[in-house]
Amino acid sequence: MLLARMNPQVQPENGGAGPGSEQPPRKRKEVLVVKERNGVQCLLASRDGDEQPRETWGKKIDFLLSVVGFAVDLANVWRFPYLCYKNGGGAFLIPYTLFLIIAGMPLFYMELALGQYNREGAATVWKICPFFKGVGYAVILIALYVGFYYNVIIAWSLYYLFSSFTPTLPWTDCGHAWNSPNCTDPKLLNSSVLGNHTKYSKYKFTPAAEFYERGVLHLHESSGIHDIGLPQWQLLLCLIIVVIVLFFSLWKGVKTSGKVVWITATLPYLVLFVLLVHGITLPGASNGINAYLHIDFYRLKEATVWIDAATQIFFSLGAGFGVLIAFASYNKFDNNCYRDALLTSTINCVTSFISGFAIFSILGYMAHEHKVNIEDVATEGAGLVFILYPEAISTLSGSTFWAIVFFIMLLALGIDSSMGGMEAVITGLADDFQVLKRHRKLFTFAVSFGTFLLALFCITKGGIYVLTLLDTFAAGTSILFAVLMEAIGVSWFYGVDRFSNDIQQMMGFKPGLYWRLCWKFVSPAFLLFVVIVSIINFKPLTYDDYIFPLWANWVGWGIAGSSMVLVPAYIVYKFFSTRGSIRERLAYGITPASEHHLVAQRDIRQFQLQHWLAI
């Protein structure tokens, strides 16, 4: 492939004419051109002559591992298996796979192509439709919110890992300083009581449950979100270590993060395989796996099954956080992002499915040991990985080894996902503000330190309430809304046909009709459906038996609204900050920056019916 450099006279972004345009001093532009095998020359990048060229991944595998590492996170382990079990087992795979094909993969593909072609972060990528730049700011803010509490979950895993380096795991028995007088060894409990009155997984007084809630969280010392107390020094130290690891993984950009993921993205698969092989040899494991895979097609008649499948496929793939756009922006221009989208999204979903075998083999073992039904031990979320699984491990031969291995896996799953979220923030803002790009290391430190400071609220004695609030509202309806606007902005305002031409310039072929129809109709409809359902199904926030006060719910909606409001707010700002008539302001707002000179010539594609009908 031939790489050539040219230095033509490039027109300013606003075209230099018309009432809505500005005329900044002309700068020399450097255009990189790739000459493909068929002789067609494609634009690789355009930048000011005094700017540094955009870095790229050291190797293609660095990019793939980064995407897989981000998408495959803790939810693959603690949420999907339980959803599959409670929604008809194998039958749940039907709506899950359907939504993967018609919505998950198309959105995944769209974000990779968008970032790779424009070589920009989540905010500046909207030079394709300036009015929608607020969408970029919204997803950056959401990614920042997630960083506030996600790092705390990683810190919990690190604390558990340190606690595992003992001959006897601290959650094996009672008698520790954190245990209550009610602490009871589960082996001594009456199984009929567990089976008839409460789920085993919700039983509060087992050593594992008390270690988590009293030894780690110190939840018993808080009466609610209004009484969170001070940060706990043990978790504070763990959080500091996590933030330091994240900082040094990101401070030099993808050159360093691309190497870290060789460990963090591959290690979980090795550990998962080891846990699976050992798990299926345990007594009762087959019962757990049978419960996981049982097929109940009648459950497909229930709307909740389809809703769970839709929301899980969306959040599992991680579209909308600006991460995929940021990662793809460091690809080579002619990289085959179509193949990457299919490969990485498939790996993510297959991982979710396989992890269910490792989880339910252990749950079957737990049910067998305590002579209860599978439904009495099956659960999701933090209770699964910080109570049930550790308790099961404590009963195994060589429990210390298995605990260390398991929590190393959780650490790896969390670290690379958190790296992705922070990279979205750093790349998104650094591309928008050149001063931040010139001082990337300092900016990376500022982002890391900022997330650390806000995370302090989540490691207090009532921190779990703050974490639950953020987890529910920071990236719930708001991220669904942001991706809906992203899909509309790309498919309708920028245009599916133009977007397809961009992809053809990169890879030499246009997306098929199937992808174009999904982008324009199916994916937006899917997202609209999920947004509406998330609002309709909203219930006042709770944590176990604790009901959050009304004001806490309003604070949560304020957090959600703070990101969503950026979308219309930026449209209003852009409209009133642009000079010209109403028609001209609208035209400049929905026309790609590179075509603003056409607006001055009144050649406005978006004002023609053909633009909106094109596929």
From Swiss-Prot:
Where is Na(+) 2 bound in this sequence?
71, 76, 316, 348
Post-translational modification remark: Palmitoylated. Palmitoylation regulates protein levels and neurotransmitter transport.
How would you describe this protein's topology in the membrane?
A: Multi-pass membrane protein
- GO molecular-function term, one example from the UniProt record: neurotransmitter:sodium symporter activity
Provide the residues annotated with a glycan attachment (glycosylation): 182, 190, 196
| Reactions the enzyme catalyzes | (R)-noradrenaline(out) + chloride(out) + Na(+)(out) = (R)-noradrenaline(in) + chloride(in) + Na(+)(in); dopamine(out) + chloride(out) + Na(+)(out) = dopamine(in) + chloride(in) + Na(+)(in); dopamine(out) + chloride(out) + 2 Na(+)(out) = dopamine(in) + chloride(in) + 2 Na(+)(in)
Q: List the disulfide bonds.
A: 174-183
Compartments where located: Cell membrane; Cell projection, Axon; Synapse, Synaptosome
Q: Where does dopamine 1 bind?
A: 73, 143, 315
**Pfam families per the record?**
SNF
Residues annotated for Na(+) 1 binding in this entry: 69, 72, 416-417
Q: Which GO terms describe its biological process?
A: amino acid transport; dopamine uptake involved in synaptic transmission; norepinephrine transport; sodium ion transmembrane transport
Q: Which residues bind (R)-noradrenaline 2?
A: 85-86, 380
Its Gene Ontology cellular component terms are: axon; neuronal cell body membrane; plasma membrane; presynaptic membrane
Write out the topological domains of type Cytoplasmic. Answer: 1-60, 115-133, 253-255, 331-336, 427-441, 491-520, 568-615
Q: How does it assemble?
A: Monomer. Can form homodimers in the cell membrane; homodimerization is mostly mediated by cholesterol and lipids, and regulates neurotransmitter transport activity. Interacts with PRKCABP.
NCBIfam families, per the entry: Na_transp
This molecule's function is given as: Mediates sodium- and chloride-dependent transport of norepinephrine (also known as noradrenaline), the primary signaling neurotransmitter in the autonomic sympathetic nervous system. Is responsible for norepinephrine re-uptake and clearance from the synaptic cleft, thus playing a crucial role in norepinephrine inactivation and homeostasis. Can also mediate sodium- and chloride-dependent transport of dopamine.
Protein's name in the database: Sodium-dependent noradrenaline transporter
Identify the taxonomic lineage of the organism of origin: Eukaryota, Metazoa, Chordata, Craniata, Vertebrata
